[in-house]
């Protein structure tokens, strides 16, 4: 009888241990396309008719095709820069993650790196508040994530679930840069949270799946002499006059003399403007010296550079009318530029 009793107790204990060792099932990931408009009619239109903020063009040698992306999450493609086919959906995410089912999609970049394609893109979930700054909007969850695909047109999906930057930071406009074989992300710590917008960088893992260490500040928006404080020029952000300096859209390049430069944007008397800074050390770590005046003004900015298949170097950026009553949408525009010397120079507007 004692043996049976001890045997029963032993079985009971073992069953408890087994139960404790059984892990709760992990939530099932649900991947879906986001951005763009599902069901949009695929059509062909001329470049001058496109409406897009934060445009970025990848000239893909393998397919001999140009791929245009921008805020909103749609992709367009072209063989000649003049006529574009789209819009296509190309971004997929786990909708059970913090990104959610309907995030805002800002400033994507497409890059080919080590035989794979990557999309650096900023997501915002307005339902998640990460910080509160007095006299400003609540700070929403906003962060750049890195997606990957075997094909340039996608679909792109997150490399991992890891956060590249602190959850409590509002970060955006992540841009890819490689220096001495090491990959980095250059990004903005948003002025809506910091008041004075900051451009930072952080090292990435070799496969871009995570960040390494902590980020480093390169400069602040007010370090340049040309940006204007937003409230002082009567600029409204989401309908509210807020003090601060904008830092936006970093993009790095190297001149013909090996000088390291950075395109970045802020606001001046003519609203959005395209600025330039140069690294004194010609290394990402800087220090960075700001040009005294914008490269392009008149409500244009968030520029990037790419080379056409026939060798022209072009800058693509968005432009919007200065008409205060009816400015219309932002539209991508192109300029031919020269970086063969020590600095970037605008040659002329480029018409495909």
Briefly describe each language-model feature range:
Residues 1-28:
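Bacterial Sec-dependent N-terminal signal peptides
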Residues 19-352:
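Carbohydrate-active catalytic/glycan-binding domains of CAZyme proteins
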